[in-house]
Amino acid sequence: MSHPPKLRLGVNVDHIATLRNARGGRAPDPVRAALLAIEAGADGITAHLREDRRHIRDDDMARLKAQISRPLNFEMAATEEMVRIALATKPHACCLVPERREELTTEGGLDVVGQHNALAPAIARLSEAGIRVSLFIAADPAQIEMAARLRAPVIEIHTGGWCDAITDGHHDKADAEWQRIVAGARQAYAAGLEVHAGHGLDYATAEQIAALPEIRELNIGYFIMGEALFVGLAESVRTMRAAMDRGRDRATGATA
């Protein structure tokens, strides 16, 4: 069977901004982290401008767009304010995510079935501006079907449930979540969607999911930044890249 294309790695720099904001000031700089990640092998940079600006700030997004040499993936809620900022920033891509002020991190996927009427105008405006829109959703058949109907070209499968089950030692749940991801990736690919994945991935889970030929990109931040405390950012990015490449070497099919 044919071999799928190289799997792209998007490195999320939100947690560099979290550390900076814990004390105030300008250091550590998420743009510097992005540049180092690209030098170490990242194919793109992801950053989430939340409504409460708890980590990434408006000027971070502007500087990332101006200074990095790889695609910028702008994570955002589908609000009027964020659409306006995205249209002004003109990133390569916007990933629409759910957002609640009380959450520590994005806890679930978008409910595109329940919110399709609100999402459709945002998707249309961003797409008309030449920005590639992705929807961060669970590997649920109804959500994937609606994502295709909304004509967003990309979905990002939320892998948090699978990763958490592995970490907690819940093997049956992990297996069930994994099968959902496999089925969801196949369904989305068959519907003509480009498939990305992210949330909670580490070296082992990134290597495993890299073997799914339908998946084109992984977006990973927290684990890479945590490992960077011990081995350095460049080394953690290189090790993640190597893990993904090992997994990809086991993938066959889905070459289009």
Curated annotation (Swiss-Prot):
**The entry's keywords:** Cytoplasm, Pyridoxine biosynthesis, Transferase
EC assignment: 2.6.99.2
What's a single GO CC term here?
A: cytosol
Pfam assignment, any one:
PdxJ
Gene Ontology MF: a single term: pyridoxine 5'-phosphate synthase activity
User: Where in or outside the cell is it found?
Assistant: Cytoplasm
Q: How does it assemble?
A: Homooctamer; tetramer of dimers.
**What is the role of the protein in this entry?**
Catalyzes the complicated ring closure reaction between the two acyclic compounds 1-deoxy-D-xylulose-5-phosphate (DXP) and 3-amino-2-oxopropyl phosphate (1-amino-acetone-3-phosphate or AAP) to form pyridoxine 5'-phosphate (PNP) and inorganic phosphate.
Protein family per UniProt: Belongs to the PNP synthase family.
| Protein name as it appears in the record | Pyridoxine 5'-phosphate synthase
Species in which this protein is naturally found: Bradyrhizobium sp. (strain ORS 278)
Q: What is the lineage of its organism?
A: Bacteria, Pseudomonadati, Pseudomonadota, Alphaproteobacteria, Hyphomicrobiales
Q: Which gene encodes it?
A: pdxJ
